[in-house]
Amino acid sequence: MAERTTSGTPAKRSVRRRFSRRKGCRFCADNTLKIDYKEIRNLRYFITERGKIVPRRISGNCAEHQRKIREAIKRARNIALLPFTAGHSLD
């Protein structure tokens, strides 16, 4: 049964949205990390198992470094260091 208020109308439940703490950009935090299309091990963290580039809101990158990651992944794909689609092993 639905809860009812004194006026007889159904009560509205307050829905709380849970926001996780914003991840910091790992490249801004550690200046020794470089984005290079030849470093496949670093680029793997920014690609899903289906071969898609992980969005900024999930990876936690800042806009500048997300653009650099995107370009590095595209370069690595063009010279066959990374797969375009799923089903190809990265090893």
Curated annotation (Swiss-Prot):
One of its GO terms (biological process) is translation. One of its GO terms (cellular component) is cytosolic small ribosomal subunit. Pfam families: Ribosomal_S18. Signal peptide: none annotated. SUPFAM superfamilies: Ribosomal protein S18. The keyword Metal-binding does not apply. It comes from the Bacteria. Keywords: Ribonucleoprotein, Ribosomal protein, RNA-binding, rRNA-binding. Binds as a heterodimer with protein bS6 to the central domain of the 16S rRNA, where it helps stabilize the platform of the 30S subunit. HAMAP family: Ribosomal_bS18. NCBIfam families: S18. Belongs to the bacterial ribosomal protein bS18 family. This is Small ribosomal subunit protein bS18. It comes from Syntrophotalea carbinolica (strain DSM 2380 / NBRC 103641 / GraBd1).
